[in-house]
Amino acid sequence: MKNICQLLSEKDFDVICPNLLNQETPFEYSQEELAYRNFTENIGFVNASEEIKSLLLDIKDKYKKVYIVGFSVGATIAWLCSEEDCLDGIVGYYGSRIRNFVGIDPLCPTILFFPEREQTFTVDQLISSLEKKNIEIHKFYGQHGFSDPYSSKYDEKSAQEALNRMVDFLLKH
């Protein structure tokens, strides 16, 4: 997250990165399952999206444009916020739980990045259910985490291509 915040800042975007975990230190990569369980049991998608919507209300008048960029759980949270009229766009990387909220129709430009495969669902099936909506979807070589340079699933080529598409999307909208 810090890398993406830094990169976007270097491209002259103001970046706000809220701490949705309500704890000082992040989970270690080896604690991925524990981190996800903590999120689902103690925070949840609805509560997290309400926290982000509240933040959006606080900042919307301070900026010409407001976007949400989310990874994994954050991508699903961005998706849940996509019906807010104060958003100018969302970017979602491997938001696997979007599959639980396919009834949402984003009101803002939306770009989603998925890996070729996920452990818990069929990526092509989710993409197929989302293609009817007016959103941009890209599938990249690799697995969940392909854009995270600290992940064992990191794929440099896919990460760079997704990053370029994200920046182009943000500049376009």
Question: Locations of the language-model features?
Answer:
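Serine-hydrolase catalytic machinery in alpha/beta-hydrolase-like enzymes
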Residues: M1-D61
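Alpha/beta-hydrolase fold nucleophile elbow
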Residues: K60-F71
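Gly/Ala-rich beta-loop-alpha elbow adjacent to hydrolase catalytic centers
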Residues: G70-G74, A78
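A conserved short beta-strand
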Residues: C86-S96
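Short beta-strand/loop motif that positions the catalytic acidic residue
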Residues: I111-F114
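Acidic catalytic loop of the alpha/beta-hydrolase fold
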Residues: E116-F121, S129
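Conserved loop-alpha-helix segment in the C-terminal half of the alpha/beta-hydrolase fold
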Residues: D124-I135
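C-terminal catalytic histidine-bearing segment of alpha/beta-hydrolase fold enzymes
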Residues: N134-H173
